[in-house]
UniProtKB/Swiss-Prot annotation:
InterPro entries: PCMT (IPR000682), SAM-dependent_MTases_sf (IPR029063). One of its GO terms (biological process) is protein modification process. NCBIfam families: pimt, PRK00312.1. It comes from Desulfovibrio desulfuricans (strain ATCC 27774 / DSM 6949 / MB). It catalyses: [protein]-L-isoaspartate + S-adenosyl-L-methionine = [protein]-L-isoaspartate alpha-methyl ester + S-adenosyl-L-homocysteine. This is Protein-L-isoaspartate O-methyltransferase. Its EC number is 2.1.1.77. Disulfide bonds: none annotated. GO terms for molecular function: protein-L-isoaspartate (D-aspartate) O-methyltransferase activity. The active site is at 62. It is an enzyme of class 2 (transferase). It is found in: Cytoplasm.
């Protein structure tokens, strides 16, 4: 495998900056996080290509551009508390933690919870707190959150998540009907009300749970 640092620099230049990702903190984090460690060993040669990859158990790691875009759309600042629904490979959580956020992340699949938890610990990402549970219920004991990011698509915005979003916060979630055809929505909470913005079409795995599919 070519030097991962060189591949990351090329990924940032050709896949992210060339497509409008201009948040310096996002670009720095994407340059630093070793994406090849978050994919299956047999697929590591493809880790820095702009494509999603299977991670087992019917799940995928999003393409680098999507991770960067969602990180930029969250408008995070260092020190923010971020709730992530759908840990998956752990790559998105690692990027946000590298940006200086405290990340609370939820995974429902036991195997991914174990595998990803082990990897995050090996990488020394102490700013990531992971639990296994129904993500559509959020993490009420750690609320409120400055930002909430949902990495799976559901039929509607789960009410527990809006309740756990702090005033002035942002919630980013794919919403729409099956099969995996959603709209990426960004909601802002102002004076207790949620105002939504349609950011365009999106394709994500299904959000499974009491308030999902």
């Amino acid at each position: 495998m070519v030097d991962p640092k060189r591949l990351r620099r090329r990924m940032v230049r050709e896949q992210l900056e060339a497509r409008g990702i201009n948040d310096a903190e996002v670009l720095a984090a994407m340059s630093a996080v070793p994406r090849h460690l978050f994919v299956q060993e047999a697929l590591r040669a493809q880790a820095y290509e702009d494509t999603p990859l299977p991670i087992g158990y019917g799940q995928t790691i999003s393409q680098p551009y999507v991770v960067a875009l969602m990180s930029q759309l969250l408008e995070v600042r260092r020190g923010m508390r971020v709730l992530e629904i759908g840990t998956g490979s752990g790559y998105q959580a690692a990027v946000l933690a590298t940006m200086g956020c405290t990340v609370f992340t939820v995974e429902r699949l036991r195997e991914l919870y174990q595998d990803t938890g082990n990897l995050l610990r090996q990488l020394g990402l102490r700013g990531v707190h992971m639990q296994r549970r129904d993500g559509t219920l959020g993490m009420p004991e750690a609320a409120p959150f400055d930002r909430i990011i949902v990495t799976a698509g559901g039929p509607e915005v789960p009410r527990p998540l809006t309740d756990q979003l702090d005033e002035g916060g942002i919630l980013l979630i794919p919403v729409g009907p099956r099969p995996r055809a959603q709209r990426l929505m960004r909601f802002r909470k102002e004076q207790g009300r949620m105002t939504g913005e349609d950011l365009g079409p999106a394709i994500f795995v299904d959000l499974v749970g009491d308030h999902g599919w």
